[in-house]
Amino acid sequence: MKTKKQQYVTIKGTKNGLTLHLDDACSFDELLDGLQNMLSIEQYTDGKGQKISVHVKLGNRFLYKEQEEQLTELIASKKDLFVHSIDSEVITKKEAQQIREEAEIISVSKIVRSGQVLQVKGDLLLIGDVNPGGTVRAGGNIFVLGSLKGIAHAGFNGNNQAVIAASEMLPTQLRINHVLNRSPDHIQKGNEMECAYLDTDGNMVIERLQHLAHLRPDLTRLEGGM
């Protein structure tokens, strides 16, 4: 009885080109052989003489740079195809470390004085003041348990969902991602903690901290970090 050969590659056509779903359990050599066989049998053309974009999905497989190059060269050997992207569900240790750092809440107890810059990759919890001329920067959110009278820049790595909160909100400048607000025309009422965030139109808004409960529900993770 003849054994049916295992299919290691599934090809699906989309409006953006072709998507190749590659088996993540077989060996890399078996994968290349399976892909070579499929590409030699099938003919792919858009009917207009233009190259077709190929999106490769690796699943739970990690490829070294040399292996990615082999895969890309094999697909590109078909004159009508070119590799647009290669996606894997597996991340490197460096990427995992970066994700961990960006999600980490860094707690610092100090006064940030004029000319000083305090920067963290994740969220910043500052127990102390930011004096005029002082700067705090975070890839995530900024929480100041004290007076914010200097500059605060949250979400500097492109995070529009970041917020800035302070016990006393009197900054010379607020910035979330690339949105800048110089010396906000705002007078804090009472002693309630306030926060700044970007609304759905990308405008900076300053509200009482309680408003964040429904605007940024994921911030409840701070309960475990404080």
Curated annotation (Swiss-Prot):
User: To which protein family does this belong?
Assistant: Belongs to the MinC family.
Superkingdom to which the source organism belongs: Bacteria
In terms of InterPro entries, this protein maps to: CAP/MinC_C, MinC, MinC_C_sf, MinC_N_1, Septum_form_inhib_MinC_C
Q: Cite the Pfam families for this sequence.
A: MinC_C, MinC_N_1
Question: Could you confirm whether the keyword rRNA-binding appears in this record?
Answer: no
**Quaternary structure and interacting proteins, as annotated:** Interacts with MinD and FtsZ.
> What is this protein identified as?
Septum site-determining protein MinC
Where, by residue number, does the polypeptide cross the bilayer? none
NCBIfam families this protein is in? minC
Organism the protein comes from: Bacillus subtilis (strain 168)
| Function per UniProt | Cell division inhibitor that blocks the formation of polar Z ring septums. Rapidly oscillates between the poles of the cell to destabilize FtsZ filaments that have formed before they mature into polar Z rings. Prevents FtsZ polymerization. The MinCD complex plays an important role in asymmetric septum formation during sporulation of B.subtilis cells.
What is one GO biological process annotated to this record?
negative regulation of protein polymerization
Record gene name: minC
Q: Could you tell me the keywords of this UniProt record?
A: Cell cycle, Cell division, Septation
